[in-house]
């Protein structure tokens, strides 16, 4: 039993761990910076942790060690994810499982434990202070206030970001609240004691004591809801609550005596006696310390003496009416204890910086924060989506529409047939060279083959996951049918609402199935496009001679004079089309090059440094860069988006001009054709080759899109299959557990007393058979005689005749026989001895003989 009046928080203990090794491995795996750049920082973080976890005594030097390590943990929390890869081991300080550690890969968990030990150190320093002087009391109150402040910081700032299913029992919200109120109560108690020593007025001391009582009461109520705070602490808080309630009334009674309110004095003294008696009830069981018990007993003696004196004086002299307790005015409260969070804990960034700072330089300052790396990836994804989908894809779509319009107008075939009546047009030669150099047919066939392989691979992964879901659903249905819905009471497979349960997985399966359905239809469209132009592409991929053989020469080699003006206007309009296409190609190439060169890392590091300076207490998150992203994308690519709109308007004008010129050209050409100068066959052949070239470009784009789609889909289905495997395994384990629970025998079949009684009844009514000679049964031992003279107990069964104990059959063990070791003489052996055969010669227990009852 301790002799202290107040409680302190014990330290949580940890084991040695190389945090630097986990950080080093993480830097190597996730960052593009070499870990050797941070060798000094890695050594420093290990040294800080080693010093912090070895703080085991109540000495002020430990405060700096814990605060320094905690500050660096807060700082590196903005550089690394919470699960950096270090398994932190900590033993509880309170509760009934202090020998069982909790291991977590969690930086916030480590920070929480370090701050918890800082609060424990403050409380132990307070208990160790000299509370026999006013200065010592002020110091102790300050330590207790800092302890409550650190615990408040843990509760409000660290615990909400812990990201654990449930915090340790001695660090959950209820336990922390109880500890906060406890140390505030002990700080307030120091102020009360100082007021007593300084000779404050009774009324002021009463207000301080009343607040002490309130705080102990709040601490005790929270402790009752905690799983970690012991019964001894709860009894201590309750006793102190009643003690200071009595002390407050005692001081209020003294104030009443001074103000000559003798009736109220007696009422308050009576209430004080009642309170101290309630406090003394907590002494049962030996939970309270000797000092607390002595304080209660001393206060009770003083109260009883004063009450006796006050009642005699009032009865003989003053004759004041004693008011009931309900009419007494509630005592005012004077609160002095406040939870004070040390600035080193509340604002650790202010104590990190250059080497002259209190905690020295911040570690890993040259390491790019993890959130910045994620932000870079997010920006690059948004940039690529903007460039590819909103600009390049839009331009390519407009170009495809333009070629469809030109093809419907039979352009440029009709122009080329007239301008180049013999041989191959220059544009066609360029297209053919491009087809040959790209090995177009093989490229398209290989691309379609790759798409088939990727699709088959993704589909196989998906089918595996779906088969697992179907098998699990079938198993669950079979067991549900076997045991019934009342006993098989877990959710059905498709109705499991857990975060990654059946409901979500089946819904995702439907989504993925939809992806496959739409992609298969798109793949078929692309194949049909390829099959439609395969033969024409084969001609384009051939030699110039084979192309010339495919294209018939015109029957006339000169252009009629009547057709030249219309031909010139159409050629001019078509040249505008080609210039528009050329500008688009150059713009797309330039845009892609600029997108590849758009390195945001230097600028985002500057922005991250600005954010760290502006918000030192806030860990950098990707959301902090949203405005930065928007401004940068607008500055770099807004002009390109506007150019797309201008291109769209320009294309509409050019198309209108081409249609007008082509209409005039076709009218003039029909007159020439009627005169016998037609070249329709050559025109159609040239148009067919030109259309095949542009269709080839379109198919190449489609194939690239398909390949990217299936590569992205593979990541989705693999992740989904992994979730399915985990969920199915969990469901099967759950099913086995539930089935074992259902198949367990009912508790009624385990009634040992009933079985033993039935066995004795059976032995009483049946003559036991002679035991085998190799299994000796013990001699029956006479049971003790029952005690006849007992205290009379009134019972509704008094008239029932008392049952006599039944005799124990030979060879049957009874509870009153006890346990004997050795080889007792059994009936069979006795019979052998009567015939002159030797019996056992040694009654010493032999371990090889086991344990026998008798």
UniProtKB/Swiss-Prot annotation:
Residues 632-699 form a coiled coil. Residues 767-782 have a biased composition (Pro residues). Residues 739-782, 801-854 are annotated as: Disordered. The keyword Ribonucleoprotein does not apply. Residues 5-402 form the BRO1 domain. Keywords: Coiled coil. Pfam families: ALIX_LYPXL_bnd, BRO1. Residues 746-759 have a biased composition (Polar residues). It comes from the Eukaryota. SMART domains: BRO1 (SM01041). GO terms for cellular component: endosome. Interacts with pacc-1 by binding to its two YPX[LI] motifs. Belongs to the palA/RIM20 family. PANTHER family: PCD6 INTERACTING PROTEIN-RELATED, PROGRAMMED CELL DEATH 6-INTERACTING PROTEIN. Required for the proteolytic cleavage of the transcription factor pacc-1 in response to alkaline ambient pH. May act as a scaffold protein that recruits the calpain-like protease palB/cpr-8 via snf7/vps-3 to its substrate pacc-1. This is pH-response regulator protein palA/prr-1. The lineage of its organism: Eukaryota, Fungi, Dikarya, Ascomycota, Pezizomycotina.
């Amino acid at each position: 039993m301790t002799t202290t009046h107040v409680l302190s928080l014990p330290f949580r203990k940890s084991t040695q761990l190389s945090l630097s090794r986990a950080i080093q491995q993480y830097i190597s795996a996730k960052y593009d910076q070499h870990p050797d750049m941070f060798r000094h920082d890695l050594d420093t973080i290990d040294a800080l942790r080693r010093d912090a976890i070895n703080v085991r005594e109540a000495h002020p030097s430990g405060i700096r060690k814990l605060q320094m390590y905690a500050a660096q943990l807060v700082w590196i929390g903005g550089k690394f994810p919470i699960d950096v890869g270090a398994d932190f081991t900590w033993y509880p300080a309170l509760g009934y499982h202090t020998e069982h550690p909790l291991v977590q890969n969690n930086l916030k968990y480590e920070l929480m434990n370090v701050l918890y030990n800082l609060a424990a150190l403050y409380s132990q320093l307070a208990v160790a202070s000299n509370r026999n002087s006013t200065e010592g009391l002020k110091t102790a109150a300050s330590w207790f206030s800092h302890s409550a402040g650190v615990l408040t910081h843990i509760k409000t700032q660290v615990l909400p970001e812990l990201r654990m299913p449930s915090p340790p029992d001695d660090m959950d919200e209820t336990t922390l609240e109880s500890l906060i109120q406890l140390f505030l109560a002990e700080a307030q108690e120091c102020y009360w004691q100082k007021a007593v020593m300084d000779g404050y007025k009774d009324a002021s001391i009463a207000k301080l004591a009343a607040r002490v009582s309130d705080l102990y009461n709040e601490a005790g109520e929270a402790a009752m809801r905690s799983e970690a705070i012991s019964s001894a602490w709860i009894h201590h808080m309750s006793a102190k609550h009643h003690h200071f309630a009595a002390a407050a009334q005692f001081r209020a009674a003294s104030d009443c005596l001074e103000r000559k309110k003798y009736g109220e004095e007696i009422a308050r003294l009576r209430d004080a006696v009642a309170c101290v008696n309630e406090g003394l009830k907590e002494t049962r069981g030996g939970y309270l310390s000797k000092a607390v018990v002595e304080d209660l007993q001393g206060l009770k003696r003083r109260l009883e003496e004063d009450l006796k004196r006050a009642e005699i004086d009032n009865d003989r002299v003053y004759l004041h009416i004693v008011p009931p307790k309900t009419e007494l005015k509630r005592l005012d409260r004077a609160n002095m204890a406040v939870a004070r969070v040390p600035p080193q804990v509340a604002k650790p960034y202010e104590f990190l910086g250059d080497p002259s700072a209190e905690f020295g330089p911040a570690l890993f300052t040259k390491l790019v924060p993890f959130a910045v790396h994620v932000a870079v990836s997010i920006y690059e994804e948004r940039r690529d989506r903007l460039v590819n989908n909103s600009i390049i894809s839009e331009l390519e779509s407009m170009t495809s529409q333009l070629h469809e319009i030109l093809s419907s107008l039979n352009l440029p075939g009709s122009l080329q047939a007239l301008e180049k009546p013999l041989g191959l047009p220059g544009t066609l030669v360029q297209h053919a060279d491009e087809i040959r150099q790209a090995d177009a047919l093989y490229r398209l066939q290989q691309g379609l083959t790759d798409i088939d392989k990727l699709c088959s691979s993704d589909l196989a992964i998906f089918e595996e996951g779906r088969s697992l879901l179907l098998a699990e659903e079938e198993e669950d249905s079979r067991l549900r049918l076997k045991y019934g819905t009342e006993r098989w009471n877990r959710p059905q497979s498709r109705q499991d609402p857990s975060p990654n349960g059946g409901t979500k997985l089946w819904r995702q399966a439907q989504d993925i199935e939809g992806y496959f359905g739409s992609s298969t239809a798109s793949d078929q469209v692309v194949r049909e496009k390829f099959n439609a132009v395969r033969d024409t592409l084969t001609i384009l991929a051939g030699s110039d001679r084979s192309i010339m053989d495919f294209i018939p020469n015109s029957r006339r080699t000169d252009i009629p004079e009547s057709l030249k003006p219309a031909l010139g206007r159409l050629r001019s309009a078509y040249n505008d089309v080609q210039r528009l296409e050329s500008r688009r190609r150059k713009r797309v190439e330039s845009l892609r090059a600029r997108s590849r060169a758009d390195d945001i890392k230097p600028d985002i590091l500057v922005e991250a440094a600005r954010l760290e300076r502006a918000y030192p207490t806030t860990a950098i998150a990707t959301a902090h860069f949203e405005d930065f992203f928007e401004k940068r994308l607008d500055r770099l690519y807004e002009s390109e988006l506007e150019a797309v709109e201008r291109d769209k308007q320009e294309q509409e004008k050019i198309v209108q001009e081409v249609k007008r010129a082509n209409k005039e050209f076709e009218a003039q050409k029909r007159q020439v054709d009627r005169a016998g100068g037609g070249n329709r066959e050559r025109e159609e052949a040239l148009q067919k080759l030109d259309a095949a070239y542009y269709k080839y470009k379109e198919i190449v784009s489609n194939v690239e899109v398909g390949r990217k789609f299936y590569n992205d889909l593979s990541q989705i289905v693999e992740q989904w299959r992994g979730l399915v495997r985990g969920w199915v395994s969990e469901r099967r384990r759950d099913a086995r557990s539930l089935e074992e629970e259902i198949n367990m025998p009912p508790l009624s079949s385990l009634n040992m007393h009933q079985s033993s009684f039935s066995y004795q009844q059976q032995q009483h009514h049946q003559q036991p058979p002679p035991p085998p000679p190799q299994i000796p049964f013990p001699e029956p031992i006479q049971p003790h005689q029952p005690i006849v003279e007992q205290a009379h107990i009134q019972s509704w069964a008094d008239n029932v005749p008392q049952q006599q104990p039944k005799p124990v059959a030979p060879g049957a063990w009874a509870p009153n026989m006890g346990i004997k070791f050795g080889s007792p003489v059994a009936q069979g052996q006795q019979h052998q001895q009567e015939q002159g055969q030797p019996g056992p010669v040694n009654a010493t227990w032999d371990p090889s003989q086991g344990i026998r009852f008798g």
